[in-house]
């Protein structure tokens, strides 16, 4: 486990962030796409880009964080400065269906403007945004959240939560089950109710035009963000369920629902998005139990869109069970589909020794496979207390301060941009040693690589740098980044190495 600093140091660090006003950069000004041959995210200069980030998801009204001040409801410029200081250069921001389309066909343009404001401000701090249509078990009708009532069609399955229990009584004022009844089961169990399964199937089947409405939501969203280069992509849906597993039990077989239900639906949404936005990447996700391989045979839209497609995946234990094996499976998915990959959720806020061990092991595995990640969750925004699909609380304690355990272990030394093809990188959380190696490529139009490092936390006694080839590589420190420049005279295929060692 990484060595810890006194909590007073943590609080002083937060205080300094809140008052100092970190320099603003334009790192989020370059459009991100995918190199299908390497399956790496790249910017418009041809540099490979790597992201560490967090989730900012508000699952209840008003479906967005407050944009002013600093408290448990905010994601303001104060919060953005904190993330920038920690080296977190991306957020997964809830772009919520009930927030934007509260009633069918009626779009809340005020909501869109607030999300646009958050995206624009975050970009000033070098933070890219993934827009995520987040949901957990679809609806408050099923004790959780995600879809407005108009988008939930259970057909004849009105016996929720059967087969977990007999039908719950409904609150006549809200039309939803009572919270005390919902609390009888873990929220994830409600996916496997007959009513929720039927509602997902009706959504995929375009019953009552619901798939068309989903596509319209994304078309309108893409129209609003097509010119925002700091949008890293559109995530079509969070943790989609398989569909009606009671009518078709084979949907429970890993990969089957991806092929039968999700892939056709994603193609419909892709087509709608591409009528207004040909640039941004689409993030697509399989069911949560794709243990052996995702069931997709192609990316949404087909092979021509491999360079704008990213397979989004999560890792939690349970339901996942073997980190090394399942990452190998995901990497094989990326090689097969020739698309990018992104771990868009992992637990970064757990309190147990196992939570900590799992998180640190996942970070190391992500480095090994050159994968970007986003932790769950920056702030709870009330979702834990409201039984809205949160496994645990957030990066913040009840007073609004960043928790010591989070600060120590999510701010890691890593490359944010590499001017070539990355061979590998590694951060040793005990010794703080960091190594990076990459190959100069002919198609990269930049010689500048960027490494984030938290000097105050990890290198407070100073550091030493070693580069190779010595006569062709220079470096300089700019705040909490090291800028590495290699000579334009280096030929393609030349290996460049960089090492950072704490004194």
From Swiss-Prot:
Q: Which GO terms describe its molecular function?
A: endoglycosylceramidase activity
Question: Where would you find the membrane-spanning parts of this chain?
Answer: none
- The EC number(s) this enzyme carries: 3.2.1.123
The places in or outside the cell where this protein is found are: Secreted; Nematocyst
The record lists its disulfide bonds as none
Q: How does activity depend on pH?
A: Optimum pH 3.0. Highly stable at acidic pH.
Q: Which InterPro entries match?
A: GH5_C, Glyco_hydro_5, Glyco_hydro_5_CS, Glyco_hydro_b, Glycoside_hydrolase_SF, Glycosphingolipid_Hydrolases
What family does the entry list? Belongs to the glycosyl hydrolase 5 (cellulase A) family.
According to UniProt, the name of this protein is: Endoglycoceramidase
What organism is listed for this UniProt entry? Cyanea nozakii
């Amino acid at each position: 486990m990484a060595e810890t600093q006194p909590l007073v140091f943590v609080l002083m660090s937060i205080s300094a962030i809140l008052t100092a006003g970190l320099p603003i950069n334009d790192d989020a000004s370059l459009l991100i796409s995918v190199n299908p041959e390497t399956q790496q995210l790249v910017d418009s200069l041809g540099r490979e880009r790597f992201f560490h980030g967090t989730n900012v998801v508000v699952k209840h009204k008003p479906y967005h964080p407050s944009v002013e001040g600093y408290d448990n409801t905010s994601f303001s410029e104060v919060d953005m400065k904190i993330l920038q200081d920690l080296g977190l250069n991306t957020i997964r921001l809830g772009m919520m269906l009930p927030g934007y389309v509260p009633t069918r066909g009626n779009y809340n343009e005020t909501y869109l403007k607030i999300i646009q404001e958050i995206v624009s401000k975050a970009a000033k701090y070098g933070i890219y945004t993934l827009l995520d249509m987040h949901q957990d078990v679809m609806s408050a009708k099923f004790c959780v959240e995600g879809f407005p009532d108009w988008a939930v069609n259970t057909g004849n399955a009105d016996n929720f939560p059967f087969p977990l229990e007999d039908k719950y009584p409904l609150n006549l004022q809200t039309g939803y089950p009572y919270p005390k009844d919902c609390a009888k089961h873990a929220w994830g169990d409600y996916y496997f109710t007959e009513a929720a399964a039927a509602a997902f199937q009706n959504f995929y089947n375009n019953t009552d035009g619901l798939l068309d409405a989903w596509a319209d939501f994304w078309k309108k969203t893409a129209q609003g963000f097509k010119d925002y280069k700091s949008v890293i992509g559109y995530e079509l849906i969070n943790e989609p369920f398989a569909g009606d597993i009671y009518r078709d039990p084979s949907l429970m077989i890993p990969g089957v629902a991806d092929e039968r239900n999700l892939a056709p639906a994603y193609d419909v949404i892709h087509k709608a998005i591409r009528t207004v936005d040909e640039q941004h990447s689409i993030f697509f996700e399989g069911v949560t139990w794709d243990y052996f391989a995702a069931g997709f045979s192609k990316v949404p839209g087909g092979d021509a869109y491999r360079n704008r497609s990213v397979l989004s995946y999560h890792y939690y234990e349970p339901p996942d069970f073997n980190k090394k094996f399942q990452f190998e499976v995901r990497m094989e998915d990326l090689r097969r589909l020739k698309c990018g990959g992104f771990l868009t959720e992992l637990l970064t806020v757990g309190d147990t020794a196992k939570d900590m061990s799992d998180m640190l092991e996942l970070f190391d595995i992500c480095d090994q496979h050159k994968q970007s990640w986003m932790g769950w969750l920056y702030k709870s925004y009330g979702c834990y207390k409201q039984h809205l699909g949160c496994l645990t609380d957030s990066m913040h304690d009840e007073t609004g301060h960043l928790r010591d355990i989070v600060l120590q272990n999510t701010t890691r030394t890593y490359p944010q941009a590499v001017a070539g093809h990355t061979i590998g990188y590694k951060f040793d959380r005990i010794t703080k040693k960091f190594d990076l190696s990459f190959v100069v490529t002919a198609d990269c139009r930049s010689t500048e690589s960027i490494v984030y490092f938290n000097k105050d936390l990890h290198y407070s006694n100073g550091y030493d740098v070693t580069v190779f080839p010595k006569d062709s590589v220079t470096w300089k420190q700019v705040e909490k980044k090291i800028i590495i420049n290699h000579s334009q005279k280096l030929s393609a295929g030349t290996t460049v190495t960089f090492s950072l060692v704490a004194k």
